[in-house]
A protein has these predicted regions:
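Rossmann-like S-adenosyl-L-methionine
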Residues: 1-226
Length: 227
């Protein structure tokens, strides 16, 4: 593939490893040609265009308008006709209404910035309930945080780090998330409810203990004053 990259657009600097990274993402997506794919934080459409020939349709979303213009050009120069791109803040573009209008994704590929995904974006993804999510991250810490937020509904199917920046502590990490069965989801939600209830009870007991201690101290002080 050929790519046009403008001065305001993001592109992986290590092109050889970038190819390996995109191959891993495509492998994890396990496309058959029938899927509607959402590519979140698409940048110049590199992953979107890379997987397009394996999908029925790919929708890319990116915050930077100039990058989206590059993404459209990149589809054109590579004769790719099954992509659509939208520019705007992810939490404002990716909504339940957007999915109703454009179709429920079979697969979501997400490659957010170091800060990870906004909670509203995660909730919309959970509402959409795709069969698979491929999460590409340059920050394993925020990736782990986001995976925890999706743990009730998705399980980790595979993990593959890619050394994009040799001789540095930085790494790109690709995680495949697979939708849990209905029975598994029900059990996970039950366990979470029990944990939350236990935490609430422990907090209430601690507050009651503190109150009783304060009342006892006040009573002792009153007795001292009476003496």
């Amino acid at each position: 593939l050929k790519f046009k990259v403008g001065p305001k657009s993001f592109y992986q600097t290590n092109t050889e490893q970038a190819y390996h990274l995109y191959c891993v993402a495509r492998e994890f997506a396990n496309l058959t040609g029938k899927e509607l794919v959402y590519d979140l934080y698409t940048g110049t459409g590199t992953i979107a265009n890379f997987v397009a020939h394996k999908a029925k349709k790919v929708i890319g979303i990116e915050y930077v308008p100039e990058a989206i213009e590059d993404a459209k050009v990149n589809s054109q120069v590579n004769n790719i006709e099954n992509t659509l791109f939208y520019a705007g803040d992810m939490k404002d573009i990716l909504t339940d209404d957007f999915i109703t209008q454009h179709g429920r994704p079979d697969v979501i590929i997400t490659d957010p910035p170091r800060a990870g995904m906004h909670p509203d974006v995660i909730q919309v993804i959970l509402n959409a309930a795709p069969g698979r999510i491929v999460y590409v991250s340059c920050n394993p810490a925020t990736q782990a945080r986001d995976l925890q937020l999706m743990d009730d509904y998705y399980k980790v199917g595979a993990v593959q780090p890619v050394d994009m920046f040799p001789h540095t502590p930085h790494v790109e990490n690709v995680v495949l998330l697979e939708k849990r069965s209905d029975a598994d989801i029900k059990q996970k939600l039950k366990e979470r409810k029990e944990r939350e209830q236990a935490i609430a009870e422990a907090k209430a007991a601690k507050e009651a203990e503190a109150l009783a201690k304060a009342e006892a101290q006040a009573e002792d002080l009153t007795e001292e004053e009476q003496k």
